[in-house]
């Protein structure tokens, strides 16, 4: 999702969308909008975003970026966004998120950093939601 500011647009994570919508006040006489917002919140609460915190998101960004820097590569904005939104739980998922992963960075290490920063509960999948 994009947030558009006066002179700048910014891409935000599912966690940030969830936080924004939860803190948004209900608008009277906007029944369809309120229903839509509630449906989005219900969906996002079934994703890893529901188990993330501001601190865990910052820590994940920091640790994965540091790992990439030590590997001599750069994690792209879209890749970081997918890491935070999906919270990969396997090396295969890391490879799907990071382009040319095998040539750029160790997927095992990325997975370890994701689990350490976001927490096991944010990474483990609920089979009912797949």
Curated annotation (Swiss-Prot):
Xref: InterPro entries: HRDC-like_sf (IPR010997), RNA_pol_Rpb4/RPC9_core (IPR006590), Rpb4/RPC9 (IPR005574), Rpb4/RPC9_sf (IPR038324), RPC9 (IPR038846)
Keyword Transcription recorded: yes
Predominant localisation class: nucleus
UniProtKB keywords: DNA-directed RNA polymerase, Nucleus, Transcription
Highest taxon listed in the record's lineage: Eukaryota
Family: Belongs to the eukaryotic RPC9 RNA polymerase subunit family.
Role, per record: DNA-dependent RNA polymerase catalyzes the transcription of DNA into RNA using the four ribonucleoside triphosphates as substrates. Specific component of RNA polymerase III which synthesizes small RNAs, such as 5S rRNA and tRNAs.
PANTHER family found in the cross-reference section: CALCITONIN GENE-RELATED PEPTIDE-RECEPTOR COMPONENT PROTEIN, DNA-DIRECTED RNA POLYMERASE III SUBUNIT RPC9
Protein name (Swiss-Prot/TrEMBL): DNA-directed RNA polymerase III subunit rpc9
Record organism: Dictyostelium discoideum (Social amoeba)
Taxonomic classification: Eukaryota, Amoebozoa, Evosea, Eumycetozoa, Dictyostelia
């Amino acid at each position: 999702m994009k947030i558009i500011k006066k002179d700048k647009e910014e891409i935000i994570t599912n966690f940030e969308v969830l936080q924004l919508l939860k803190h948004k006040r209900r608008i009277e006489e906007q029944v369809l909008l309120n229903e839509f917002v509630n449906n989005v919140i219900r969906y996002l609460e079934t994703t890893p975003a529901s188990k993330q915190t501001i601190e865990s998101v910052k820590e994940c960004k920091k640790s994965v970026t540091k790992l990439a820097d030590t590997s001599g590569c750069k994690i792209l904005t879209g890749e970081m966004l997918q890491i935070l939104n999906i919270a990969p739980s396997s090396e295969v998922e890391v490879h799907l998120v990071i382009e040319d992963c095998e040539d750029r960075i160790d997927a095992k290490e990325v997975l370890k950093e994701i689990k350490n920063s976001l927490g096991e509960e944010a990474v483990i999948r609920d089979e009912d939601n797949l």
